Amino acid sequence: MIINHNMSAMFAQRTLGNTNLSVQKNMEKLSSGLRINRAGDDASGLAVSEKMRSQIRGLNQASTNAQNGISFIQVAESYLQETTDVIQRIRELSVQSANGIYSAEDRMYIQVEVSQLVAEIDRIASHAQFNGMNMLTGRFARETGENTVTASMWFHIGANMDQRTRAYIGTMTAAALGVRDVGDESILNIDDPEKANRAIGTLDEAIKKINKQRADLGAYQNRLEYTVIGVNVAAENLQAAESRIRDVDMAKEMVDYTKNQILVQSGTAMLAQANQATQSVLSLLR
């Protein structure tokens, strides 16, 4: 029997230390709900998980971006509806003025209302804003000529670079719609039947332009609504995949934790027994 090196105690101590470390890791995983709390737990799994998390957060923000884009389009469309109502009223007055039964004085009164309605078109265009940005004054108009300033509204609808789309909104001022002269600022004149007759054609073109813009906005909105559905599904599926990598199986981890607790208790008892064994040497010295 030797006393300088108690191999049984050394083995029990080493095993107990390893088991205590396992219990510590079990407690970390059970308290956090994560299988991977640091790179040392699973280096490759952590790298894959972080990439997935980046995509998930990007997709969630892309969904928000698309919903904000829908709100932007709905606001623009509501202002265009107001403009349409005004144009329709001007057209109605033009049809009325084109009838020969009205006197010059009658048409003068009609012209006064037309003048106010034309001013209202410009007011709508100047007040149509979203987050401080004018929507109907050409800021987001598609390029129509070599010297025309081009802009658009970009919607970033993906998690990665260049995953975006753009929307155009034409200029909807009175001049752009043809009811105010660009040069001398004169408004649509319906003070005689012939002018009123020509005005009807001008107003039909204005209505056609607005309808085309509203149809485009409707198409943009439909696309963004499908985008929201698509990115939400992608984020959900990616979240499930990331969970399988990162999250801990609580039942399995609890079984492992219970096993290690038992090993700690038995290891502690065996270490005490191994240390006690060397005490018997003293009986030989009596």
UniProtKB/Swiss-Prot annotation:
One of its GO terms (molecular function) is structural molecule activity. It comes from Treponema phagedenis. Component of the core of the flagella. The flagellum consists of an outer layer composed of repeating units of FlaA around a core that contains several antigenically related polypeptides. Keywords: Bacterial flagellum, Periplasm. Belongs to the bacterial flagellin family. This is Flagellar filament 33 kDa core protein. One of its GO terms (cellular component) is periplasmic flagellum.
